[in-house]
Amino acid sequence: MKFISKVHGEITYDEKNIIIFNKGILGFDELKRFILIELEEYEPFKLLHSLEDDGVGLIVTSPYDFFEDYELKLSEDIINNLKIEMPKDVMVITTITLNSEAKKITTNLQGPIIINISNNLGEQIILDNSKYKIKQPLIGE
């Protein structure tokens, strides 16, 4: 299937790769269907793009690529909502805020996006743990 993004142009995807966010994503509660696109020339970053709004695409990454000690505990509600059966089925990504100055690029470690890769259900959660920041610099000083 094909989708035209305002920013990224034509995107080809397979319908089986559509990720459903029943609760939407923070700031985009009404948008439920997204695809995750590899950005090979910009590894380890990916594009999480809405299929319902051609202007909504979020740059995301695995927090573990930058913060090896990042940890979170999923609540029973999240495990049930996403129908998670095995830890290996869980993908964790965080949104990126870009900046022309590399030291000002940040990620939201307090609001990770959890995806069950076995059934393509996703949900953004808010961690109560105050040690993680909403705008955590990706690159140290």
From Swiss-Prot:
Alphabetical list of Gene3D superfamilies matching this protein: BH3618-like
Gene Ontology annotations for the cellular component aspect, listed alphabetically: cytoplasm
Pfam families, per the entry: FliW
Disulfide bonding pattern of the chain: none
Predominant subcellular localization, coarse grouping: cytoplasm
GO biological process annotation, one example: regulation of translation
SUPFAM superfamilies xref list: BH3618-like
UniProt subcellular location: Cytoplasm
Annotated keywords: Bacterial flagellum biogenesis, Chaperone, Cytoplasm, Translation regulation
Subunit: Interacts with translational regulator CsrA and flagellin(s).
NCBIfam families for this protein: PRK13285.1-1
Biological role stated in the UniProt entry: Acts as an anti-CsrA protein, binds CsrA and prevents it from repressing translation of its target genes, one of which is flagellin. Binds to flagellin and participates in the assembly of the flagellum.
Family to which this protein belongs: Belongs to the FliW family.
Record-given protein name: Flagellar assembly factor FliW
Lineage: Bacteria, Bacillati, Bacillota, Clostridia, Eubacteriales
